[in-house]
Amino acid sequence: MDLIAEPNLKELINSTTHKWIFVGGKGGVGKTTSSCSISIQMALAQPKKQFLLISTDPAHNLSDAFGEKFGKDARKVTGMDNLSCMEIDPSAALKDMNDMSVAQNDKNDGFSDLLQGGGLAELTGSIPGIDEALSFMEVMKHIKRQEEGEGEKYDTVIFDTAPTGHTLRFLQLPQTLSQLLQKFGEIAGRFGPMLNSLTGGGQNMDIMGKVDELKANVEKIREQFTNPDMTTFVCVCISEFLSLYETERLIQELMSYEMDVNSIIVNQLLFADDDAEHNCRRCQARWNMQKKYLDQIGELYDDFHVVKMPLCAGEIRGLNNLKKFSQFLNKEYDPVADNKIIYELEEQK
């Protein structure tokens, strides 16, 4: 007899093996709220462990969701001892790369002059997919710090990802980089001496060593991302045709990358049949539409954890509101017993 997946994320929230959790889907479906909710519930369920929530979306929303400012360095969420947040800023990361390159290069060569003028940042800033590449570099830096015992040690990292297209490019990077580095290694092996002479003459750049080290790091991430005990992807959608269609496309892509995906959060549900006091014709009509697509989700993903989350009367912002909302990831929302909670959110300034 097949086991039926529970309609909650209790198993993931209490997981002791997952290092990487990605949360993603179509734009505007509640990805940030969902990633914040997962992070909060995991931190509450496992108080002795440390969790890090990273935004890889250029339109950062973590600061807005929690009502406090986060930046490129991890910082604890006020009121949570074991949950930190950070927002990767591609433009700041490019400036850091440029400044680092200036410091490492000979001040008398022409390449250094180019960098002094912000040449690297200007050159790379317009490359398609640079945001995803920089996000991936942050992952690699994080793994390296963990292995070397530097900084805060995090047991699980949760990613609040960009809309689907950006996320897929991000997840393709380990495979793409691995192939690229293989080719680059072959070229560097043949033309290494010539490349050294072109980069300033006096410096003996260990190109092959750098490439091999980068390849090893990329391969390590590939192995972790495709290990279902270490990495999983939580899809977020709303109960409408376009969102369902994009979720199916995302799941098929994730499976082609051999990445584990077995959870879907369906946001903004009205549950109008059980809310007679606040029901209206428009609410009932939309709920009837939502039920149609919920049935399709149930048929398509009968072996997934499908979590049905309510549409709240107010904004889900601030730690207290996020705690109230996130409890329904752990315990299914009951439209009758839990009805009052969605009308009792604190108003945020």
Curated annotation (Swiss-Prot):
Coiled-coil stretches noted in the UniProt entry, renumbered to this chain: none
Alphabetical list of Pfam families matching this protein: ArsA_ATPase (PF02374)
One Gene Ontology CC term in the entry: GET complex
Binding site for ATP: K26, G27, G28, V29, G30, K31, T32, T33, E240, N267
Subcellular location: Cytoplasm; Endoplasmic reticulum; Golgi apparatus
Keyword set includes Metal-binding: yes
Residue positions binding Zn(2+): C280, C283
Main EC class the enzyme belongs to: hydrolase
GO biological process, any: tail-anchored membrane protein insertion into ER membrane
Gene Ontology MF terms in the entry: ATP binding; ATP hydrolysis activity; metal ion binding
Active site per UniProt: D57
Main location: cytoplasm
Organism superkingdom: Eukaryota
EC number: 3.6.-.-
Keywords, sorted A to Z: ATP-binding, Cytoplasm, Endoplasmic reticulum, Golgi apparatus, Hydrolase, Metal-binding, Nucleotide-binding, Transport, Zinc
InterPro entries: Anion-transp_ATPase-like_dom, ATPase_ArsA/GET3, ATPase_ArsA/GET3_euk, P-loop_NTPase
Family membership: Belongs to the arsA ATPase family.
Function summary: ATPase required for the post-translational delivery of tail-anchored (TA) proteins to the endoplasmic reticulum. Recognizes and selectively binds the transmembrane domain of TA proteins in the cytosol. This complex then targets to the endoplasmic reticulum by membrane-bound receptors GET1 and GET2, where the tail-anchored protein is released for insertion. This process is regulated by ATP binding and hydrolysis. ATP binding drives the homodimer towards the closed dimer state, facilitating recognition of newly synthesized TA membrane proteins. ATP hydrolysis is required for insertion.
HAMAP family assigned to the protein according to its UniProt record, in alphabetical order: Asna1_Get3 (MF_03112)
Quaternary structure and partners: Homodimer. Component of the Golgi to ER traffic (GET) complex, which is composed of GET1, GET2 and GET3. Within the complex, GET1 and GET2 form a heterotetramer which is stabilized by phosphatidylinositol binding and which binds to the GET3 homodimer. Interacts with the chloride channel protein GEF1.
Protein name: ATPase GET3
Gene: GET3
